[in-house]
């Protein structure tokens, strides 16, 4: 508990996960944990009645109580994997890595009433300069050739 930061405002300790621990609560939990350990040690010390067989019971070591966690992926009854979470057929090609998520496309411009379009902002791509005059239109002359 020494590793937790102590608040200057209240007499509580706060861990990195944001959970607030009260010192009284921690003291009660420690007491109840000590009581349970004492009960277990008393149970271990009590002599056990002999069973009908004449075999003596070996004391259980702590090493025998602990069992390793099985992490084998191919064991039956384990976690089944699909292609999306790393399982499936073996791939014999070179992978390029993960693909970055797609960027959301911009929302479409929907025209509404005239007031909204009159007072709305212009799209950022089109800048209108009121001082600039439109270019002059040139008429096309048609060259007419006489047919013979």
Curated annotation (Swiss-Prot):
Domain of life (superkingdom): Eukaryota
The keyword Phosphoprotein is assigned to this record: yes
Alphabetized InterPro entries for the sequence: DUF4666
Region entry Disordered, spans: 1-148
Coiled coil: none
Protein species of origin: Arabidopsis thaliana
Bias type Basic and acidic residues, positions: 36-47, 58-67
Biased composition (Polar residues): 1-17
Keywords assigned: Phosphoprotein
Family matches, as Pfam families: DUF4666
Protein name (database record): Uncharacterized protein At1g15400
Phylogenetic classification of the source organism: Eukaryota, Viridiplantae, Streptophyta, Embryophyta, Tracheophyta
Compositionally biased spans, kind Basic residues: 128-148
Keyword DNA-binding: no
CC terms in the record's Gene Ontology section: nucleus; plasma membrane
Modified residues (Phosphoserine): 100, 107
């Amino acid at each position: 508990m020494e590793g937790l930061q102590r608040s200057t405002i209240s007499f509580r300790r706060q861990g990195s996960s944001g959970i607030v621990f009260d010192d009284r609560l921690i003291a009660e939990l420690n007491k109840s944990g000590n009581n349970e350990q004492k009960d277990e040690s008393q149970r271990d010390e009590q002599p056990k009645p002999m069973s009908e067989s004449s075999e003596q019971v070996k004391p259980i070591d702590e090493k025998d109580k602990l069992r390793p966690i099985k992490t084998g992926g191919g064991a039956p009854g384990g976690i089944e994997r699909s292609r999306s979470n790393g399982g499936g057929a073996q791939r014999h090609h070179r992978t390029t890595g993960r693909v970055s998520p797609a960027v959301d496309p911009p929302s479409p411009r929907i025209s509404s009433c005239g007031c909204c379009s009159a007072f709305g902002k212009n799209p950022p791509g089109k800048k209108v300069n009121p001082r600039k005059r439109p270019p002059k239109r040139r008429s096309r002359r048609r060259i007419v050739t006489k047919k013979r």
